[in-house]
Amino acid sequence: MITQKEKEHLAKDKQNIYLRIISGIALVSLFVIAILCLKTLFYILMILVGLGMLSEWYNMTYPSINYLLIGLIIIPIPISLLIFLSMEESNRLVIMLYFCILWSVDTFAMIGGKTFKGIKLAPKISPKKTWTGLITGTVSAGLVSVLVSLIPNYHIEHYYFSNKIYLFIISCILALIAQSSDLFISYFKRKFNIKDSGHIIPGHGGVLDRFDSIILTAPVFFCINIYL
């Protein structure tokens, strides 16, 4: 027999999922338009994301100067690298692919974790994450990136992103790094006894909650584009 409290909890979870889906679709649509059509809008969005992440980091770590300084290093760098890459018109599609990888790993890791349950990945840092979620998210990100690359006229000049085998491998690596980045930020949130960094994005929490994966993935993505 389900208690009234459990019913309320289930109803709240259901409402949260709907909010997450609606706000997620809106956010993804905005970024797709910005990346593919309006370069200036992408710059503005990334700057706003960076400022939002810095603001939430400040609220989370204040008054610790050492941790504040960490935020001033780990947040502006990936934001700047993505903006720098987007300045080159030929990088437009590969940046779109990068965000598709991040969105798919986040989505399918959550679906895989909720569906298959299994052993906890890092129970002390992020209790809801599981190894099955990690594997599901990683493989799905690789498959999604390959499917996106099959879209007619979706031609990427970079060899390692245009080759389907290399693309799958790179996507899986970026997916693993994305989840490591998520755990990295979760460590700081647990340290300061914070569940969500904010509430500005309905169903997702704060800007830092939504975009934490770029912190470690953007530098790797940048190096792949520039040096390989």
Curated annotation (Swiss-Prot):
Localization terms from the record: Cell membrane
Entry's Gene Ontology cellular component terms: plasma membrane
Catalytic function, reaction form: a 1,2-diacyl-sn-glycero-3-phosphate + CTP + H(+) = a CDP-1,2-diacyl-sn-glycerol + diphosphate
Transmembrane segments: 31-51, 65-85, 93-113, 131-151, 165-185, 206-226
Pfam families tied to this protein: CTP_transf_1
GO annotation, biological process: CDP-diacylglycerol biosynthetic process
Membrane topology: Multi-pass membrane protein
EC annotation from Swiss-Prot or TrEMBL: 2.7.7.41
Keywords: Cell membrane, Lipid biosynthesis, Lipid metabolism, Membrane, Nucleotidyltransferase, Phospholipid biosynthesis, Phospholipid metabolism, Transferase, Transmembrane, Transmembrane helix
Source superkingdom: Bacteria
Classification via InterPro entries: PC_trans
Pathway where this protein functions: Phospholipid metabolism; CDP-diacylglycerol biosynthesis; CDP-diacylglycerol from sn-glycerol 3-phosphate: step 3/3
Molecular function via GO: phosphatidate cytidylyltransferase activity
Similarity section: Belongs to the CDS family.
The protein's name in its UniProt record: Phosphatidate cytidylyltransferase
Organism: Rickettsia prowazekii (strain Madrid E)
Gene this chain is encoded by: cdsA
